[in-house]
Amino acid sequence: MFPTHKSNLLRKHKECSFHSTSCKGIEITKNMAIGSKATILAIGTALPPNIIYQSDYTDYYFNATNSEHLSELKQKLTRICVGSNIQKRHFYLTDEMLKDHPNLATHREPTLDSRNQLLAPGVLNLAKDAAEQALKEWSQPRSRITHLIFHTATGCVDMPGPDFELLNLLGLGSTVNRYMLFHNGCYAGGTVLRLAKDIAENNPDARILAVCSESTLSIFRGPSAANMDTLVGQALFGDGAGAIIIGCNPDLAVERPLYEIISASQSIIPGTSHAVGGRVEEAGFVLFLKPEVPTYITNNIRECLSRVFEPLGITDWNSLFWIVHPGGRKIIDGIENELNLDNERLLATRKVLEEYGNILSGGVIFVMDEMRKRSKKLGMTTTGEGAEFGVLLGFGPGVTIETSVIRSCKSL
């Protein structure tokens, strides 16, 4: 058993009739009205325009870093790319940037200033584009936004931070409450969801804009036989931003509920802090990523799920819809095999991995967007591919697992 922090479990909505069960003194409701919990009201995503297909990436990378002579490493990256199940990725980094900042293509030369100079506008503009998409879908006055949550693990450490800059770019009010989260990593999509849930359920009139924006420019560097983690990172990660708007008690005349956040919790797998993470150095953000990460996650995933679904009496994992961080093929395959999931359960996650790679903290927002669009396209009755309850999973440094119980809404 590993330590955990939980948000509130299900609470009774006074205007609804339902059946309930009692679990350790907490009233658990399975048939609550939509809106009594924090509800996702809009989703937006954004991608930079520069696309590189995975089949071309090895040649691009070794040419860009002047490393064609490292033939063994090139063969290694080719094998990693072929086995990644990624078709293409989007990047903010351009050939012009590499020409103007050639040290970015070296392995460990000091480049922190150059990276920060380039990352600040890139991450911010991606965040703005995703937020604009969410605000457009929500279609309510921006003056109704009361809180802003911004996460990035890829630079932008100025003061005031990108949360301040985004507030001004979007024309939001000067009294909006801001929360800036740095370097949580790939699990942070679940973190912003959990934080937004706590804010919404303690401020019933709140409307929270939560944004995750990332760029791999922070970790782009030349190859080295002494650091294979760098090579894996080059094959796996992509750029993108995701945004969601969250609030309680939606006005159904003008707002459309997409998903309800029933519970949210975070767990750390003991003894795994060495497995994945990074350090900010003069050479930029230096990634470390060990091959044991998928095993750590799959060995602990059942315990995470049992803990949060036991109050609902749910033990059939195939009865759920799945919004899983697209952290890599081995993680996705491991979860599917460990839980004996039907092949279609993780199709939304696999689709996002194929199309965009691992987009770090924004990954689960992209999967959520794919899930609701897929549900509508297939004529499903709910935004969860016809299922009522689902799970959102984020994984990252720690090793940390974010586990959220999600309830779908009617698919329109």
Please identify what each model-predicted range represents.
Residues 35-38, 142-146, 174-177, 203-208, ...:
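Short coil/turn connectors at secondary-structure junctions
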